[in-house]
Amino acid sequence: MPAIVIVGAQWGDEGKGKATDLLGGRVDYVVKPNGGNNAGHTVVVNGEKYELKLLPAGILSPNAIPIIGNGCVVNLEALFDEIDALKARGADTSKLRVSANAHLVAPYHQVLDKVTERFLGKRAIGTTGRGIGPAYMDKVARLGIRVQDVFDESILRQKVEGSLAQKNELLVKVYNRRAIDVEEIVAYFLGFAERLQPLVIDSTIELNNALDDGKVVLMEGGQATYLDVDHGTYPFVTSSNPTAGGSSVGSGIGPTRITRVVGIIKAYTTRVGAGPFPTELFDEMGEYLQKTGGEFGVNTGRPRRCGWYDAVLARHAARINGFTDYFVTKLDVLTGIEKIPVCVAYDVDGVRHEEMPMTQTEFHHAKPIFEYLDGWTEDISGAKTLDDLPENARNYVLELEKMSGTRFSAIGVGPDRDQTIVVHDLIDG
């Protein structure tokens, strides 16, 4: 049966949570294959808004088993805070499972993240300060602590000692901070062991057995294509691979088992933090999109930078990920705009580029070349089919589809899961 991947096609905050929630009632497993509690997503169910960070959006789907995959980095304190907050609102979190091979975010990762950003000053990346980058650094440097280590005190202590031997030198001699005590960290992790134990599984075996048994598995990528450490706007990226290929690595599901890759893309573009953004708006229209679209980060509350739809980025994202479908969100936010610019190419130092520029310098110099599409004033929030849309809104969707090189299978016309036009079924279509 199908393994489906959902990937953000821009710089995050595209509405992946809504897409996962929409499909959640039809899938058996929802897996988060990468990232940590640095990437928030919002899900609206029956008019109630849920802001999730570490947990997969599938946690709100009554039939799906949500799994935090081996490619994630897990802050245990944040995990249980989020679980408790959902329980307090009546949500069932009992089916949640966590991969034994997922890495852990330690308190010292958060300390290092914050002091490093302060040290960098104007050169800072704009991280969330939640220790995600340092945790991934330890993973790659083979200094990481995994979920399974919490249940073996001697291994846990050995790993904490190895990691802090280096970090304390840095904290004390470079950043003028106090050294972190090994036993303090060991006690911190051991304090979660009893509550964590029932959640831990071999997720690779579980998920592949599920596929063998005819179950449907949905992989919900965190962050987005242009935050990918390899394919994003480096160095203004995250520390993992939130592109489609990273979903295989972060879940243990082989690439040949993936049957569908769905790109989630806004009808305009947003970005949080530093980095190049060719279509960014610095005027009242940017403020309008920000206010109308509710463009403020789930995790940090930071206002998102807003700009027009970028078809160059959309085509490139489709190529990198092998998208079979696009799910377009927030079309309703554009209602009332008379003429809507769409970026179809870049001007880089006088040369037209219809593809993503090769170098970082070229992309920083890229200026958008726009085509202008007619807007609409009618309320589209109740539309159920493409034919329900006013002519100009329908034309906008069809033109973007043509420019982006991948079929548009679903269009969001409001925040609720039911405010979605489904053109092609995202599981069987």
Swiss-Prot record:
SUPFAM superfamilies: P-loop containing nucleoside triphosphate hydrolases
Keyword Nucleotide-binding appears in the UniProt entry: yes
Enzyme Commission number(s): 6.3.4.4
Active-site residues, as the UniProt record annotates them: 13 (proton acceptor), 41 (proton donor)
Residues that coordinate or bind GTP: 12-18, 40-42, 304, 330-332, 412-414
Pathway field: Purine metabolism; AMP biosynthesis via de novo pathway; AMP from IMP: step 1/2
Positions that bind IMP: 13-16, 38-41, 128, 142, 223, 238, 302
UniProt-annotated location(s): Cytoplasm
Catalytic activity: IMP + L-aspartate + GTP = N(6)-(1,2-dicarboxyethyl)-AMP + GDP + phosphate + 2 H(+)
Single GO BP term: 'de novo' AMP biosynthetic process
Key words, A-Z: Cytoplasm, GTP-binding, Ligase, Magnesium, Metal-binding, Nucleotide-binding, Purine biosynthesis
Entry binding sites for substrate: 298-304
Cofactor(s) this protein cannot do without: Mg(2+)
Keyword Cell inner membrane found: no
Entry superkingdom: Bacteria
Coiled coil start-end: none
Residues holding Mg(2+): 13, 40
Family, as annotated: Belongs to the adenylosuccinate synthetase family.
Function: Plays an important role in the de novo pathway of purine nucleotide biosynthesis. Catalyzes the first committed step in the biosynthesis of AMP from IMP.
Family annotation (HAMAP family): Adenylosucc_synth (MF_00011)
Protein's recorded name: Adenylosuccinate synthetase
The organism's taxonomic lineage, starting at the top: Bacteria, Bacillati, Actinomycetota, Actinomycetes, Micrococcales
